[in-house]
Regions:
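Conserved, well-structured interaction surfaces
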Residues: 1-30, 44-57, 61-77, 205
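Residue-level signal for well-ordered alpha-helical segments
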Residues: 3-4, 36-43, 193, 197
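Proline-centered turn/helix-capping motifs that create local helix->coil transitions or kinks
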Residues: 26-35, 124
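Residue-level signal for pocket-adjacent positions within structured domains
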Residues: 30, 42, 211, 215
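Short coil/linker segments at helix-helix boundaries
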Residues: 32-53, 99-111
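An aromatic- and glycine-enriched ligand-binding surface/loop that stacks and positions planar moieties
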Residues: 56, 64-65, 79, 83-223
């Protein structure tokens, strides 16, 4: 790829990261799967499955190599950038570590920690939580700094890109709960005194929505 322009190298790197993302979804769902790095030919129709460990190692390396040609924050909203690549490495390595792929949990957890530390050092949280969820707010520099990968919408609110995640009334096979958040998510929000629910005297197990961090009600729908 030595003869490619800088912009072309960026595009190739974005594609490599996206391919890694989709293979990550496959091995997370199915484990060992058929694995291609080039367009398959007709005689490869019944190709053997490749070990999920081999695929995971490959896609982690792909993302690491791709970071060389990506900006930390994409100039064009909705595009892959360096922080997304490292964030994906973190998520993929956590998968391998948590499920002890190939008996290499320690190695994968180390990779995950290193990738996460790079993103944490470069990206900051938005100053106003509400801005994350409104069009006007999403255009602000501090909000863009928090959003690692955006899903772009038209001004009328319709999605101009393919929806990456399921959104509906029921749980999906990829583990998304859609409009049904888990209790684990709800319990992560502190009380208004800044303490966790297992520490705060303000927490009421019978009325868990009371005295909670304002982001609790901004995130979760309640009756």
């Amino acid at each position: 790829m030595d003869d490619l322009s800088k912009k072309s190298l960026q595009y190739v790197s974005e594609v490599r990261v996206l391919r890694a993302y989709y293979y990550y979804l496959l091995i997370a769902l199915w484990g060992d799967v058929p694995f291609y790095t080039e367009p398959p030919t007709s005689d490869q129709y019944e190709v053997e499955k490749t070990s999920r460990v081999k695929i995971l190692d490959f896609i982690i390396n792909e993302c690491n190599e791709a970071t060389e040609y990506l900006d930390w924050i994409a100039m064009d909203r909705g595009r892959v950038d360096k922080s997304f690549a490292y964030g994906l490495i973190n998520r993929m390595a956590l998968l391998g570590g948590s499920l002890d792929f190939g008996g290499k949990s320690t190695e994968y957890f180390k990779i995950a920690a290193e990738a996460a530390s790079k993103v944490i050092g470069k990206r900051l949280l938005a100053l106003n939580y509400e801005d994350l969820f409104v069009v006007e707010g999403q255009a602000k520099a501090d909000v863009r700094n928090e959003m690692i990968l955006e899903m772009i919408y038209n001004v009328d609110g319709t999605n101009v890109h393919r929806n990456w995640t399921g959104f509906g009334f029921v749980s999906r096979m990829q583990g998304q709960t859609s409009r049904h958040p888990s209790m684990l998510l709800a319990d992560t929000y502190e009380c208004i005194d800044g303490k966790r629910i297992d520490e705060s005297p303000l927490y009421d197990v019978h009325h868990p929505q009371k005295n909670r961090d304002p982001r609790f009600k901004a995130t979760l729908w309640m009756h």
